[in-house]
Amino acid sequence: RQRQMCIRDSGIIMPNLKMQKSDGRCAFLREDNLCNIHTIRPGICRMFPLGRYWEDETHFKYIVQKGECNKDNLSKIKLKKWLGIEGLAEYDSYIVRWHEYVKQLQAALPGLSEDNVKILNTFNLRVFYMTTYAGCADDKAFYAEFDRRLAMVKEKLGLM
C-alpha cells in the first residue's frame, strides 16, 4: 500500500504517501527515477518540494522545504519558474477552500466525544479520499466535484 494515515496535532486524520522503508523514496518512484503516476499525481506531488506558509486564513506563500526530498543530485529551479505551472490560480483557490474547511473541522473537534471524532474523521476520509473522483478527466472537473462534495459535507455538518 502506498498510503498511510497521519493524525495531525489537531486530531484530523489525513492520508499521506508512504515512503519506502529501504531508502525513503516515494513508493510511486520507478527505478528510472520517474513517477509512476505522473499524469494523475496529486497536487501536493506537483508542487513538491514546495510547502505553504500561511500568512492568515486565506493568504499563503510558497516556500522551499529543504531536506524533504531524499533524491540525490537535484536540479536547481527558481521558485518563480516552478510556480509557472498551468492552473496555479485554480489550485491556490482550491487550497484556500480546503484549508478553510480543515480549520472549521479543527474548531469543531474539542466539543466532540472520542467516538464522534472517529466518526467525523471516517466520514471526511470517505468523502474526500476513499471515494474516487471518476469522470474527472481534468483539473476543472476535479475542482467542480470537490466543490460539490465540500458543499454537501459543510451542509451535513452545519459548517455553512
Residue ranges and their predicted role:
Residues 2-7:
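Short, small-residue-biased leader/transition segments that mark boundaries at the very start
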Residues 8-160:
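Short loop/turn segments that flank or connect secondary-structure elements
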